[in-house]
Amino acid sequence: MSMTDRWESKLHEECGVFGIYSPDGADVVSACYHGLYALQHRGQESCGIAVNNQGVISCHKDLGLVSSVFTREVLEAMGPGQIGVGHCRYATTGSQVVENAQPLLIRHRKGNMALAHNGNLTNAGELRREYELDGTIF
């Protein structure tokens, strides 16, 4: 078996991402928690959940396993919401620090959002230069 065959025959998992929309306000925080718990095998370095309640975003993230980061008290403090996004990280680049945990909170004059992704920006420098030329501030 060649090295390529060995590589292609193995499971290649990276971060786990979970999202939910519930206009009736079903327990979004609990759904995100259980979704991340089920995806935790994809990344055990850090995890986070962000919940949007009528435009107000609450977020909690930290290093560690889902069950360690999200105690009952933390989950209750997040409150209700209609939209939730969760992320558990498997680092392929970057340091193992809480600053690299997701979801990312983005505050903009046109509104706020939480973003979780499963990948790496391989052309971050190029994108930054391009956007700065168009007037975007980083």
Question: What does each model-identified segment do?
Answer:
Residues 1-125, 130-133, 137:
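N-terminal glutamine amidotransferase
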